[in-house]
Amino acid sequence: NKRNYQKELEKLIDQAQKDNKIPSLFLHSCCAPCSSYVLEYLSKYFNITVFYYNPNIYPEEEYRKRVHEITRLVNSMESEHPVKLIEGHYDPQEFFRMAKGLEDVPEGGERCFKCYRLRMEEAAKLAEEGGYDYFTLFLYTSDAAD
């Protein structure tokens, strides 16, 4: 019995519209390309805060390029409701500590799941502290994340 998350989202949206409410959404983003459609779609129904926290991106020059792109996307996109960006702290040592002993694990294995957890926990903590109505993430949109 698989859950249909799209149908669940549609029910949330329908209820918010019936209540004449624009809920707040804290959304972790892995990168700008994966974020573009998601933001375009969800900004019709939510006030969105995009959280860019990805200590797994190395070297810092690559990380900065990605921050620039997500910033450019958020600042240039047209949206029905507000979309703002928060950049998390960048400390690749966090990722290296988490991945210690897993360096030879193939892509898509335990190291990836621990990295997902690292980012999800940070995002969930900030979403709760910020009092957002909803929290979500999208780390799996790209073929590279299979």
Report each predicted region and the residues it spans:
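A conserved beta-strand->alpha-helix junction
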Residues: 78-97
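Conserved small/polar residues in nucleotide/adenosyl-binding loops
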Residues: 140-146
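Residues at the starts of beta-strands that form the adenosine-phosphate
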Residues: 24, 47-49, 84
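A short beta-strand-loop structural module common to alpha/beta enzyme folds
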Residues: 49-57
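Core alpha/beta nucleotide-donor-binding catalytic domains of modification enzymes
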Residues: 63-76, 95-104
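Non-catalytic terminal extensions that flank enzyme cores
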Residues: 1-27
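Histidine-anchored nucleotide/phosphate-binding helix
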Residues: 33-46
